[in-house]
């Protein structure tokens, strides 16, 4: 790269360093740049176009219309294609459209929101286009601002140390050359070249946590504590070092354990097992890391809350734990670990009652139709439905008293946004009740509730060691 080009702009220098570090060893012939039309991705596209000849590679672009923003997504794609055509020589541009409704369908399956689903489908498109055009490396335009937003979001979500490593500069075929570049630097780079970019209206929507962090939290931090980024860098560097130490300790521990996480096939997927004595003898933090490893081996697709893994790590070797779709239980001399998907629960329920109506399941909510006594696998573990002289009661192995009475049929389900339950003098929101009881997020998503005739009749808190809340029927119900 020429000396004059180094002086043009700091962004170009950062990208050149990234290319030297990640591209030279791989010796790719083609780079695929993911471009949305926004400032970050356009800056990366221009930088890649300028630097590609110096590294002996060609560059091409891919842009994706997610079919989420009416005509705006199509206009973004058209803008990117026209811009690529103006380069000299013109850059090949692959315009891909995700079919209408596909993102929402994916979000329902993954249970992690529309933005997560859009990202998952977008990366599938990138992989497909990379294979089609022969690109060995895909460049994405994550910036230093994205890094801090991600770290803050994960920090407040109680993420594990592995997630607090932040966005990686490279993973597989994906390289992120702008991770040390600020958004201010990006915009300055484009302005020096007279390049205009498009703004995605969804980036200002406050319903998304990342946007609230970007537009509300970070400006507040800047106003109150100007050097917070430097302090955060040091904190996360320390976390990273401690995480590396724990990984090394786990490796040494595994060398002395000959049967760590053996697969055990079953009808509804695979479980993993290890000797109970080995698991219980491990330090708490090693158990935590073992469970993280097990989640990876089982291909758990949803983000598991840290609290859920910590609860499993406190397994006493006797009582089964079922939280956030994970299950840890004793099986003779072994402990069994499995991921219970909503689809698994639905299939089990279908087997128990082939004639039952469809579940009232909504996005993020599991619901089981109950029309007879028996054992029902739920998000918190197996619940027992018993017929007693006073009526039908729901209980579990840890709580034989249970909650009730009810009458058949009814649903056992998890929390739904807006849930309220009848109390003296009116109704009370379940979310407020969770806050008053100090229920962690990992338990809120699995605490069982009983719904009958469209009315929430009970919150069965005793299933996880909390109070019960039972709503008597009113005369006009």
Swiss-Prot record:
It is an enzyme of class 6 (ligase). GO terms for cellular component: cytoplasm. It is found in: Cytoplasm. ATP binds at residues 36-41. One of its GO terms (biological process) is tRNA modification. SUPFAM superfamilies: Adenine nucleotide alpha hydrolases-like (SSF52402), PheT/TilS domain (SSF56037). It comes from the Bacteria. It catalyses: cytidine(34) in tRNA(Ile2) + L-lysine + ATP = lysidine(34) in tRNA(Ile2) + AMP + diphosphate + H(+). Belongs to the tRNA(Ile)-lysidine synthase family. Ligates lysine onto the cytidine present at position 34 of the AUA codon-specific tRNA(Ile) that contains the anticodon CAU, in an ATP-dependent manner. Cytidine is converted to lysidine, thus changing the amino acid specificity of the tRNA from methionine to isoleucine. NCBIfam families: lysidine_TilS_C (TIGR02433), lysidine_TilS_N (TIGR02432). This is tRNA(Ile)-lysidine synthase. It comes from Treponema pallidum (strain Nichols). The lineage of its organism: Bacteria, Pseudomonadati, Spirochaetota, Spirochaetia, Spirochaetales.
